[in-house]
Amino acid sequence: MIEVTLNTVKVRNWDNTITTIPPYLLVSDSFQNWRGMRESGGRRVKRSINIDMNSVRFCTPEMLDKYRKIRLLKDYVEQTEAVIEEYNKKHHIDNSVLVNGRRQTNLGVFRAYLTAYLKSLPDVNKELTCMVRQLQPTDHGIPMELYFFCAIKDWVPYEGVQADVFDHVLAIIPEFDLQVFQSPSGRDFQRVLS
């Protein structure tokens, strides 16, 4: 706040504009205070990419071999395979039937990759929450949400970090045999009609 009178309150906004509001709004409405973000260890990123549900599948041995070659996934794939193998053996699971027992999926491995990728970035604050999670499936696919805090708080560099992360995510999705869900566009309709 920059000025408080009986009839008005002048507030400097995050973008340096000044807003005049009546005092009763301070009690009746909510306001976003950017000071907490400035004083904290980072600025939050909370964005999703919708994955096409038709591209989710159990991992084949060939897929797992490919994923083991990814530096950020090698340990995860090996440890998870050991846990799954032990579970299936302990419970006498007949693995000749695909739905029996536990198996890794390309979506689960992708989620593990994204988590490891975020934690490897120098601009992500490792002391604050950093997670990748699936949200409720919708008619637009499965939202895969990246939730983390960027250590850079200034707007332009923050947007750059966020864009770099999502550029990378969009580029590597095909490596996991997954597809992004995207509503049909004019080009899609032209393909169908021709």
Model-based region annotation:
Residues 1-94:
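Soluble accessory domains appended to multi-pass membrane transport proteins
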Residues 69, 73, 78-194:
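Long, non-transmembrane cytosolic or organellar matrix-exposed soluble domains/tails
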